[in-house]
A protein has these predicted regions:
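Charged, amphipathic alpha-helical oligomerization/scaffolding segments
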Residues: 28, 73, 77-80, 100-103
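Small-residue-rich helix-loop
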Residues: 1-73
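A structural signal for well-ordered alpha-helices, especially hydrophobic packing surfaces
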Residues: 33, 37-40, 82-86, 105
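Generic hydrophobic secondary-structure packing signal
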Residues: 3, 71, 77, 93-96
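Short helix/strand-capping connector loops at secondary-structure junctions
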Residues: 57-59, 75-86
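Acidic, carboxylate-rich catalytic segments that either coordinate divalent cations
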Residues: 94-106
């Protein structure tokens, strides 16, 4: 899927150019999941998530494509990535973040 390839390219670039940007990536993806959950619960104003009205259509399309279960699954994967950054869990946080991107893209 082209969206997945493009997203993966961005993640690869972030890792290559600034390995410390993993925390920003995790934060952004978690924010997106929280916004998608808010949309699923009927909320239309996502400004509290830093998402403006001109971006709502994109989030609605994602929300229509993703189930609540999938969004929860992605949130859990992102939590694991965060724990790997902090050393609470062993493993590569970048690989785990890529897993979250894949789950959001399918």
């Amino acid at each position: 899927n082209n969206n997945y390839e493009a997203a993966l390219g961005i993640v690869d670039s972030m890792e290559e150019n600034d390995r410390n940007s993993i925390t920003l990536l995790i934060w952004m993806l978690t924010r997106d999941c929280n916004a998608l959950n808010a949309l699923k619960m009927g909320k239309q104003n996502l400004k509290e998530f830093g998402i403006w009205d001109n971006q709502i259509d994109l989030y609605q399309k994602m929300g229509n494509r993703l189930t609540k279960h999938r969004i929860t699954e992605v949130t859990n994967v992102l939590d694991d990535a965060d724990k790997k950054v902090k050393g609470v869990l062993p493993g590569n946080s970048w690989l785990t973040a890529r897993e979250a991107v894949k789950l959001l893209s399918v």
